[in-house]
Amino acid sequence: MDPKLLELLVCPVTKGPLTYDRERDELVSRSARLAYPVRDGIPVLLETEARPLTDAELEA
């Protein structure tokens, strides 16, 4: 994930920052407790496509 692109992207739900999880290829919004997929290098920032984060994932 390009760091400059990551600086520009925000969570569509909270408008908060996103972090990149390289292992799962997801953009994570801790405030919304959601992980957005990155498919073929393209972030899919749709709430309907995001998966909810568990408490364990948020603590990691």
Swiss-Prot record:
Signal peptide: none annotated. SUPFAM superfamilies: Trm112p-like (SSF158997). HAMAP family: UPF0434. This is UPF0434 protein Aave_2563. It comes from Paracidovorax citrulli (strain AAC00-1). The lineage of its organism: Bacteria, Pseudomonadati, Pseudomonadota, Betaproteobacteria, Burkholderiales. InterPro entries: Trm112-like. Belongs to the UPF0434 family. PANTHER family: PROTEIN PREY, MITOCHONDRIAL, ZGC:162634. It comes from the Bacteria. Pfam families: Trm112p (PF03966). GO terms for cellular component: cytosol.
